[in-house]
């Protein structure tokens, strides 16, 4: 089974719409980095996505380092700063798609964004 995880920072003030746009950026950009075999398998299974949260930029960077060690494709999203946050603010991280087993080793302890 395959999935994609998007992780959002909750320590910065973002409206629901802003969070939606940042998760969309993360999902699309990360999926473009996937190899064809993984992308095709993920699409065939219905493109499962899970949205999780962290409390800081540091927490996102720790996840990036774990992705690098496990060779999982990812996309770290920095906002342009035109609306709600300062330019260059890191808002979200798209992880995968990849196997659930691999991604769970990186994000398995994180809470859902509600």
Language model segments and positions:
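Glycine- and Gly-Pro-enriched alpha-helical subdomains that act as flexible
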Residues: 4-5, 9-34
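Short basic, glycine-rich beta-strand/loop surfaces that mediate nucleic-acid
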Residues: 6-7, 45-55, 68-114
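Generic structural signal for well-ordered, non-membrane alpha-helical segments
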Residues: 16, 20-24, 60, 99, ...
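Compact, glycine-rich, soluble single-domain proteins
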Residues: 24, 32-33, 37-58, 69
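Alpha/propeptide regions of enzymes that mature by internal proteolysis
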Residues: 59-64, 72
């Amino acid at each position: 089974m395959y999935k994609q995880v998007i992780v959002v920072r909750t320590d910065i003030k973002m409206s629901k719409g802003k969070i939606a746009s940042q998760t969309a950026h993360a999902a699309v950009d990360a999926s473009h980095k996937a190899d064809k075999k993984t992308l095709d398998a993920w699409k065939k299974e219905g493109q499962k996505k899970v949205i999780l949260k962290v409390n800081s930029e540091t927490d996102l960077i720790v996840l990036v380092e774990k992705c690098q060690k496990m060779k999982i494709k990812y996309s770290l999203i920095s906002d342009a700063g035109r609306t709600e946050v300062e330019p260059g603010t890191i808002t979200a991280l798209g992880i995968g798609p990849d196997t659930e087993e691999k991604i769970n080793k990186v994000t398995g302890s994180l809470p859902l964004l509600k």
